[in-house]
Amino acid sequence: MDLLVYLPLLACSLLLFPVMLTVGREIAADACASEISGFQHLNSTGLHLTLHHPQSPCSPAPLSKDLPFSAVIAHDAARITRLTTNNPSRRPTSLHRGNKPVSNQVDDSLAVTVPLTPGASVGVGNYVTRLGLGTPTTSYAMVVDTGSSLTWLQCSPCIVSCHRQTGQLYDPQASSTYASVPCSSAQCSELQAATFNPSACSKSNICIYQASYGDGSFSIGYLSKDTVSLGGSSFPGFVYGCGQDNEGLFGQSAGLIGLARNKLSLLYQLAPSIGSSFSYCLPTSASAGYLSIGSYNPGQYLYTPMVSSSLDTSLYFINIAGMSVGGNPLAVSSSEYSSLPTIIDSGTVISRLPTAVYTALSKALVAAMGGTPHAPAYSILDTCFKGQVSKLHLPALDLAFAGGATLKLKPGNVLIDVDDSTTCLAFAATDDTAIIGNTQQQTFSVIYDVAQSRIGFAAGGCS
């Protein structure tokens, strides 16, 4: 019998139904137990999952609060490299081990690897939730990622390597609904578009995937199917990656849930049952948010159109229309806002703006903050102040998008504490691709309505 039949089936069925669990802003560590009891529920609009900040004490896969902010900067750099180079013309056409090509016909020992460079492109700036998978169902702590398509997680027996994770590995032998995906399947053919890496085929005709990231982190394993069960409902045949060689810094998560625009993403696979929209509220480390898949209340949002880009059709692009500080528009031509394509992303921490826009924003903020003492630059963050954001008085800052949607940013959406005595503007300049990251999205409800090709924003989403 093929080895794959025995591999863990951890399908990241993270998004299953519309999710809208709300939690109080301040969550003490001793309140986490009661929060877990309401982790997921099903109502008339679908399933609601709790979403955690990576450094929340209630996170199922928490990161150390002692993690230096330089690690976040490194994570962002690697992630942006991946997001902005996910183009078939820029990627290899065969699996590689280091710089040596590997045959696309491999044996069941999964002797296909890539460089073992430790990475930080998953699990530092991303948000975490739990998913149920298999029959009987077991739940796993998973990173939520709008910039990835394929859902994957670590599977027993970890033929090559697995990083340390919270909880046990998924064992496919324990699931009566597990199945491997053959090389001749349509899902195997879709891997190139989903991962920008080609698939391989085992000698027993099992499809092998490779998901790689900008800093050398990767997951390689068998493409698999199993049942995702959440909120009392089950979805059979969910396709995901069962990782047997997982290298890099993925925190303590079991794997990653892909929410990008591709046939293999969780959203697209579940769309026939629950609809092609999802929403979330990204919480601060002191609160909890939610992830929701399915129907939603359209009246609570202000919308901006999704736009297409040749950079990567699986990512979510929008257009920035303007910015203002203290009610005054930035001193920059309106054409500068649309000079670069703009991605909205759940995993990038520091947003990137076209250089002219960033320069105008920095000058306007410094002028508006008057005598606030300046601090030295921190890595790429060159507009810094002494103190912490909670102690400073900031002017109103609005971020407007095409179509009329506007984010009225709070201080914590504008500045980010990099250490105990320094806070910096949570934007940086770029001449490549602009990105609206998760710092600016925190505490807002954000809806991705793929069916109507629009993204909506509403204030107070996590409260």
Short names for language-model regions:
Residues 261-264, 272-296:
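Extended, H/D-rich, highly charged conserved domains that either
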Residues 296-331:
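Active-site gating loop/helix substructures
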Residues 159-186, 274-276, 301-309, 359-379:
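Cytochrome P450 catalytic domain signature, combining two hallmark sequence patches
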Residues 78-86, 91-92, 96, 103-238, ...:
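Signature of the N-terminal lobe/flap region of pepsin-like aspartyl proteases
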Residues 2-63, 70, 134-136, 144-149, ...:
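Aspartic protease catalytic domain
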Residues 43, 47-100:
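Low-complexity, highly charged intrinsically disordered N-terminal segments
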Residues 129-139, 181-266, 321-323, 327-332, ...:
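Aspartyl protease catalytic core from the pepsin/retropepsin fold
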